[in-house]
A protein has these predicted regions:
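Short hydrophobic/aromatic patch on the recognition helix
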Residues: 37-48
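Short hydrophobic clusters on alpha-helical segments that form packing/core surfaces
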Residues: 12-20, 66, 70, 91
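Amphipathic alpha-helical packing segments from all-alpha helical-bundle domains
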Residues: 67, 113-142, 150-157
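Basic, helix-initiating cap at the start of DNA-binding domains
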Residues: 1-36, 52-56, 61
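Amphipathic alpha-helical segments used for helix-helix packing
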Residues: 95-117
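Hydrophobic/aromatic residues within well-ordered alpha-helical segments
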Residues: 58, 62, 66, 84-91, ...
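C-terminal peripheral helix-coil segments that are non-catalytic and often amphipathic
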Residues: 2, 93, 127-140, 159, ...
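Hydrophobic alpha-helical connector segments
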Residues: 57, 71-100, 153-156
């Protein structure tokens, strides 16, 4: 098993993540990672350790990538409404990209794979990402002063995950403009602390 302070090469990490995406945890193998990376199975085992450890490393890599891409998108916007709308568009685009699955691959998106296998960790990371954004929105007066940033962040994350998990109904999830409008029309009203 690799030591905790030893880093895994980016190409091997990418191959492990791609293998997990393609086959899912049940069919994941170190041999498949080795084939994807163009290295020996021994090299994979020396770098990633056991099959279970390799799966954990690949899941962590995918979760980190998801949270980092959301953070990048949030940093492009100043208002909470725009940040949530941009994150919703990102998740909808991710959903569209996940629709194309290899013939022998698993029939689920990366986000569903992460929620099923490391959902608690992914939710915690995502909520932690949103807390300072909600706090900043509170300081700007976009949301009510009595709103708890942690609870509001959890609400935002749960809302965002629904764009991946629920089928499109009234809003066209394939249209970034429609998704932005849908989120912008409704997101902040619930966080002002006012009653309707």
């Amino acid at each position: 098993m690799p030591s905790a302070d030893r880093s895994v090469s980016p190409s091997l990490l990418g191959a492990a993540a791609a293998t997990l995406r393609r086959y899912g945890p049940r069919q994941f193998s170190l041999t498949a990672v080795a084939e994807a990376a163009g290295v020996s199975r021994g090299t994979v085992h020396n770098s990633l350790g056991s099959r279970d450890n390799a799966i954990k490393i690949a899941l962590d890599h995918l979760a980190s990538g998801f949270v980092e891409s959301m953070a990048t998108e949030l940093d492009r916007h100043d208002r909470l409404t725009d940040q949530v709308a941009a994150a919703a568009v990102l998740i909808c685009a991710h959903r569209q990209q996940s629709d194309s699955v290899a013939a022998r691959g698993i029939n689920e998106s990366i986000l569903v794979l992460l929620l099923r296998n490391v959902g608690d960790d992914l939710m915690r990371r995502s909520i932690d990402l949103w807390k300072p954004h909600v706090g900043a929105a509170q300081q700007r007066g976009e949301v009510g002063a009595g709103i708890a940033p942690a609870r509001a962040s959890e609400w935002i994350v749960r809302l965002l995950m629904s764009f991946e998990l629920l089928p499109p109904m009234g809003v066209n999830l394939d249209s970034p403009r429609a998704v932005k409008r849908f989120v912008a029309d409704h997101i902040v009203v619930g966080l002002t602390g006012g009653q309707r």
